[in-house]
Amino acid sequence: MNTNILTTRQAEELHKAIIAYLTANNLSNTASALRTELNLGEDVFDPATAKKYEGLLEKKWTSVVRLQKKIMDLESRNSTLQSELANSTPTSRQNKDPVAWLPKSPARHTLQSHRNPITCVAFHPVFSSLASGSEDQTIKIWDWELGELERTIKGHTKAVLDVDFGGPRGNTLLASCSSDLTIKLWDPSDDYKNIRTLPGHDHSVSAVRFIPSGVAGGTGNLLVSASRDKTLRIWDVSTGYCVKTLRGHAEWVRDVCPSIDGRFILSTSDDYTGRLWDVSIPNPEPKTTLIGHEHVVLCCAIAPAAAYPHLAAMAGIKKPPATSAVEFMATGSRDKTIRLWDARGTCIKILVGHDNWVRGLVFHPGGQYLLSVADDYTLRCWDLTQEGRCVKTIGDAHGHFVQCIRWAPSIVKDVPAVNGEGANGESNGTPRKAAGAAGAGGEAQIRCVIATGSVDLNVRIFAN
């Protein structure tokens, strides 16, 4: 036996461990032959010695396997970090340029108070308020700059599934929806008093979003909801009436995202599809159906205009489109993939990297990145200028499934707001400090703030 790489003592230990292993596995003839070959008499390998070395070989073997796995994991992690380093923007530029900013670990704040998994988060369009909803039936309002809980809102009788800030110009409201089949409206300027409850859906209400007042004559009074009853409904929040019902999905409608001009709505469903609706017409029908996912489609996002050049290049279009508020979209699924689509319903790219269900998506307001969260506990950043390559992974974003992600809306003076879409914010008259001043000349000021929520009961704030 070649033992050149072992010391004499190590070789003797190995020989005895092998003999003990052979003896324990009823291979006594083989063990005896090895003892003879190694000149180890019975007196040298007595029962006490055999007992001492019993199981040692197996322990050494499993230790080697564990070490090999750890080395492979570390090599993979090192490769990921090297890739991130090679493709990263210098830190000095990231700190100065919000367009290049990406979240990093650790989070600025971890917000703890919910007693059950967190399902949703939403930023106030101007102030440093964040709403979070949970399976504990409550909504909590936080000051995300200070990391402090401001109040707990009770009213729903089952899990809160989504929240959103928005509403009429100069009168920002908070909307929430629940497994109790209702949508509730709360007034932030009046201690979050419940001012209206909207019944009408026949099953759990999965998602709710205010529709921007970008279209001609838009008032900001419209709200869209998605439900397990397979429908989407559009509501007038000033009256509480359902003004349109959208039918087309064959299963539970999971998520909904309005376009910045309020004309289009993107929805996703358990029927494995996404659908784009033109809600400016009296009886909306799906304008485009996104077919390709192999499982339930849980989340969606509409790309901002700043992303058009990168997505157009990915789609092989020489000149980026500039006419529509919806030229490109993203969807995330239980099939663990993210798909990028054009307005015709053509899948232009499949982003692979998550190891579990993709739960939430948000485009960077600067247009270069798409961010995603998933049940693999991670937050991932995909670079649209590099064919959608994953350039950053926050592996410890949470200690359990990450269920939601929102980006604080950018701020522009005197322009209506919509939450989470890189849209514009305005004051609702609440006597609080704004979280950053409006940009000069009406230009949007990107707020480098992201919130995520998880089954680990934590809301996390990633901020510059």
Curated annotation (Swiss-Prot):
Region (Disordered) residue spans: 78-101
Top-level taxonomic group: Eukaryota
WD repeat boundaries on the chain: 113-154, 156-196, 200-245, 248-287, 292-351, 353-392, 397-460
One Gene Ontology term of the molecular function aspect: dynein complex binding
Transmembrane segments: none
SUPFAM superfamilies: Lissencephaly-1 protein (Lis-1, PAF-AH alpha) N-terminal domain (SSF109925), WD40 repeat-like (SSF50978)
Cell compartment(s), UniProt: Cytoplasm, Cytoskeleton; Cytoplasm, Cytoskeleton, Spindle pole
GO cellular component: cytoplasm; microtubule; microtubule associated complex; spindle pole; transferase complex
Coiled-coil zones: 62-89
Record-annotated LisH domain positions: 10-42
Domain notes: Dimerization mediated by the LisH domain may be required to activate dynein.
Description of how the protein assembles with itself and partners: Self-associates. Interacts with NDL1 and dynein.
HAMAP family: lis1
Function summary: Positively regulates the activity of the minus-end directed microtubule motor protein dynein. May enhance dynein-mediated microtubule sliding by targeting dynein to the microtubule plus end. Required for nuclear migration during vegetative growth as well as development. Required for retrograde early endosome (EE) transport from the hyphal tip. Required for localization of dynein to the mitotic spindle poles. Recruits additional proteins to the dynein complex at SPBs.
Name of the featured protein: Nuclear distribution protein PAC1-1
Organism of derivation: Podospora anserina (strain S / ATCC MYA-4624 / DSM 980 / FGSC 10383) (Pleurage anserina)
Lineage: Eukaryota, Fungi, Dikarya, Ascomycota, Pezizomycotina
Gene: PAC1-1
